Amino acid sequence: MATVSTSPLVFSVIIGVYDDWIPLDRCVRSLTQQTNAPSFEVIVVDDGSGDVAPEYIRNWTGVYQLTLIRQSHAGISAARNRGIQASRGLVLVFVDADCKFHPDCLATLAATINKSPQHNSFQLHLVGDCSGIVGRAEELRLVTLQNHLLQPDGCIRYLNTAGFAIRRARVDIEKGLFDPVAVRAEDTLLLASLIQGGELPLFVSKAIVQHAIPLSLLECFRKDFRVAQLDARTYDIIAARGVRFRVSQQQRLRMLLSMWKTAGQDSIGRLAWFVLAARQAPRLIVLFLRKVTP
């Protein structure tokens, strides 16, 4: 298996975007602040946004290797697959447009990949932006999931493409990595495929990506109700494959109690627990109804 080095091109950072130009600007700016990073390119796939990439995005092409691709609206899975086809790096790194890399993220990820030739996929450490209630609730969610789904061998039963990497050799470049059928929860469907293949991502705890949700609390609630059915359809696909990935009711209770304890920290606060519980409700209700309805 190839070892990551500083030559040739190491990382292809692939970002799908749909009208999220301002958050994307912060994301690509964070890549200019990387310290001791190996060589990388950035591929931004515009999934049919209402407006083409603004000038302040196009200007980044003069700072590092940035490729802008525009396609008709086909969904995030198709956008990422298009980015894969255009990529040249030994490792593909996926990140959401509303995320920011910590300064040593790529250097840490490269070092971990070099030391882990037995692993093909890597889950980066995701954190929230605790400057507002939406971000504190997201931090609480991420802390809980990453703590409870971490395995004794350092792998994690969790995959979130807000910060995920995979070796190029593991990917069918022409076919792509993501199933376009999954309009939502495409990363969970990918996790199911990895589990079927006997693999889990290695958790890279020191390669940190901040997920800075740009929506207001009301906008988040509206989105949660809107996408709950889409998430459930992907979970149906996973269930049809016979892959069990969801936690048991007992595990869910332990996670709720753990969240309550974590919410006692001053940096998060109890209100974040209630916000998170409310945001999870639409998805859980839809899943329950699909289970009990003939």
Predicted ranges, named:
Residues 104-135:
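Conserved donor NDP-sugar-binding/catalytic core segment of glycosyltransferases
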Residues 223-230, 241-294:
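Non-catalytic, C-terminal membrane-associated alpha-helical segments of glycosyltransferases
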